[in-house]
């Protein structure tokens, strides 16, 4: 008899659980792991753009701005932002000359 048929056996015209060993520590641990996995999967699907963009581009440091005038820094920031804003649905690789 498989676990599926054992768990989903009709009891008095209702679907119920016949197994009384649900207080087993292994069952409790498996339930906790399953719930955590579900929560992490939902968060991953909701925020995958932010998460993967941060890992792909956020951990890399940009070029050093030491000794560069503030006006040139601001111009560089605007260029970078415009390049990213072109298509928010896709990542844009920028090669500087």
From Swiss-Prot:
It comes from Influenza A virus (strain A/Wilson-Smith/1933 H1N1) (Influenza A virus (strain A/WS/1933 H1N1)). Homotetramer; composed of two disulfide-linked dimers held together by non-covalent interactions. May interact with matrix protein 1. Keywords: Disulfide bond, Glycoprotein, Host cell membrane, Host membrane, Host-virus interaction, Hydrogen ion transport, Inhibition of host autophagy by virus, Ion channel, Ion transport, Lipoprotein, Membrane, Palmitate, Phosphoprotein, Signal-anchor, Transmembrane, Transmembrane helix, Transport, Viral ion channel, Virion. Gene3D superfamilies: 6.10.250.1640. Its main location: virion. This is Matrix protein 2. The modification Phosphoserine is found at residue 64. The M2 protein from most influenza A strains is inhibited by amantadine and rimantadine, resulting in viral uncoating incapacity. Emergence of amantadine-resistant variants is usually rapid. Residues 60-80 are annotated as: Disordered.
């Amino acid at each position: 008899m498989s676990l599926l048929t054992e768990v989903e056996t009709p009891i008095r015209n209702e679907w119920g659980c016949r197994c009384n060993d649900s207080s087993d520590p292994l069952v409790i641990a498996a339930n906790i792991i399953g719930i955590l996995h579900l929560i992490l999967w939902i968060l991953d699907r909701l925020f995958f753009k932010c998460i993967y963009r941060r890992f792909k581009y956020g951990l890399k440091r940009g070029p050093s701005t030491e000794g560069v005038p503030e006006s040139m820094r601001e111009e560089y920031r605007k260029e970078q932002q415009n390049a990213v804003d072109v298509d928010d649905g896709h990542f844009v690789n920028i090669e500087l000359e």
